[in-house]
């Protein structure tokens, strides 16, 4: 659980760092590695989800702190003493993330990639015209062509990365359901917990795990 706390904290800090760098980036090529970084962060989050799910299902009967303090803190913050309310609040957060943010970002990436590819021939012709008119040197023209190609590659990569992130959001919903349903079955059938205790423990852990992952 201590390692989970460390990795989840690192994951949150990494997300904040990526956000700050993205905000202060004015040109796509200034942060051309963003699609790769996004994929790496998503894979890291999925790995943490698998590790936390294992602990939730195997040790969730011991209490809400079974998977570490970070998951417990996020879970108790959302649930606020009523785990039924917590489930609905978390469902709203998932809908916002999946339907609004993820779907919107995917659409923006798709449209940006399409328009960038459509504009490439015109940009290439403009560079050739400037080169023939003597407004550009051959080195400057070559650099501009390379920038156009890199920009097209960037938007194409972002289009693919956005679909990967959408799949990750759907996986987060399925993992939440597995944690809650599987946890209740294990807690009641194997550890003889009362239904209310099992529901409280596993819902706090599942919601906390899901919220940390969604962030």
Predicted ranges, named:
Residues 1-215:
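Hydrophobic packing and interface segments
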